[in-house]
């Protein structure tokens, strides 16, 4: 039974522990409703002593969005779970911030999750990604030419974020809902092959399953675990090397938003840094950037290569700005990796 499978996965990786209060991101679609129903049953049976709270965002992009919202609210009312709803004009925000709709929606969602986390004194956020989402992400990362870390895909836990369904197939989620007589909402935009992920989901993977490997989802999932083991070892070596070459961490906090405002800076001893193997040098740079911003999104191979050249004085400039948030400077035999302060109405 799927409920038992999810429970075993949760306990195997300690995703949920006694005393947890968890915010669930629920759209009303099959994955999130399945997650909500199963976690609610686990909580009701006291298999683990934890609480769940639901949050739902109405993006205002689809005519059916109000029906999704009402469905989530009614479902939560039926099972006695608190539900927070937020209305946002994603299209307007995307235009103002000059971002794509998909990226803007993701940012707004995660900001709302964090807002409810703090408001309710919760400590974890549950996202309903499944194994198909994970494999689709890995394929997208391959198409982008990502490093080996991109072959890991979506992890079961990343800080406060947990994904209880990450090893469950989409077909099994649909089967579970049918058995429970639950008719979840359907987002018709998932059927439109205009987004890369939809093309992979609806065209690429079915073609591979039919023509090459009917078990491609399991095969890629197995690959991700092999890569994860290797990455964990390399990351531990990177952390050791970072601690050896890092001289100072200035204005660095666990709150990445503050780091961006406070000109957080990591100072690295160039002599020690240049003695490292190049593969570790690149990882130390990425590790430093992630320490400041919480992500390496937007940092590409060419940026890292240019920073390595800067460290070896093989580039004309003494500093680089790989993007609008990041500055890297070679100064007085030190490498300074800094968040760029954004001034409002500044004359600088």
Question: PLM features: what roles do these ranges have?
Answer:
Residues 124-128, 133-227, 243, 250-254, ...:
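Catalytic subdomain that performs nucleotidyl-dependent activation
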Residues 93-97, 196-197, 229:
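Short, solvent-exposed polar/charged micro-motifs at secondary-structure junctions
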Residues 2-31, 49-53, 108, 156-158, ...:
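AMP-forming adenylation/ATP pyrophosphatase catalytic core
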Residues 69, 107-110, 145, 198, ...:
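Hydrophobic alpha-helical segments, especially transmembrane helices
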Residues 105, 193, 197, 277:
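Residue-level marker of regulatory loop/turn positions in helix-turn-helix DNA-binding domains and
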Residues 51, 66, 95, 194, ...:
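Non-catalytic, surface-exposed connector residues within folded enzymatic/regulatory domains
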Residues 1-141, 171, 179:
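ATP-dependent adenylation/nucleotidyltransferase module used to activate substrates
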């Amino acid at each position: 039974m799927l409920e038992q499978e999810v429970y075993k996965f949760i306990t195997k990786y300690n995703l949920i522990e006694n005393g947890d209060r968890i915010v669930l991101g629920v759209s009303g679609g099959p994955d999130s409703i399945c997650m909500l129903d199963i976690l609610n049953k686990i909580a009701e049976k006291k298999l683990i002593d934890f609480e769940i709270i639901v949050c739902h965002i109405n993006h205002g992009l689809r005519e059916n969005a109000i029906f999704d919202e009402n469905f989530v609210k009614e479902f939560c009312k039926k099972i006695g779970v608190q539900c927070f709803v937020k209305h946002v004009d994603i299209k307007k925000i995307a235009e103002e911030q000059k971002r794509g709709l998909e990226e803007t929606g993701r940012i707004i969602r995660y900001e709302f999750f964090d807002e409810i986390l703090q408001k309710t004194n919760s400590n974890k956020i549950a996202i309903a990604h499944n194994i198909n989402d994970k494999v689709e992400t890995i394929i997208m990362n391959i198409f982008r030419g990502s490093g080996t870390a991109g072959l890991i895909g979506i992890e079961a836990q990343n800080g406060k974020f947990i994904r209880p369904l990450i090893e469950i197939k989409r077909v099994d989620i649909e089967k579970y809902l049918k058995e429970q007589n639950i008719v979840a909402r359907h987002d018709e935009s998932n059927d439109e092959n205009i987004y890369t992920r939809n093309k992979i989901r609806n065209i690429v993977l079915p073609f591979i399953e039919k023509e090459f490997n009917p078990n491609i989802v399991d095969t890629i999932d197995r690959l991700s675990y092999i890569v994860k083991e290797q990455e964990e070892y390399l990351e531990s070596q990177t952390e050791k090397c970072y601690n050896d070459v890092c001289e100072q961490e200035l204005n660095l906090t666990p709150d990445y938003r503050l780091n961006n405002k406070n000109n957080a800076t990591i100072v690295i001893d160039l002599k020690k840094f240049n003695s490292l193997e190049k593969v570790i040098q690149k990882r130390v740079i990425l590790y430093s950037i992630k320490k400041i911003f919480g992500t390496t999104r937007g940092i590409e191979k060419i940026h890292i290569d240019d920073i390595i050249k800067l460290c070896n004085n093989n580039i004309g400039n003494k500093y680089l700005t790989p993007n609008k948030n990041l500055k890297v400077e070679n100064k007085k035999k030190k490498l300074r990796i800094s968040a760029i302060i954004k001034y409002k109405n500044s004359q600088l």
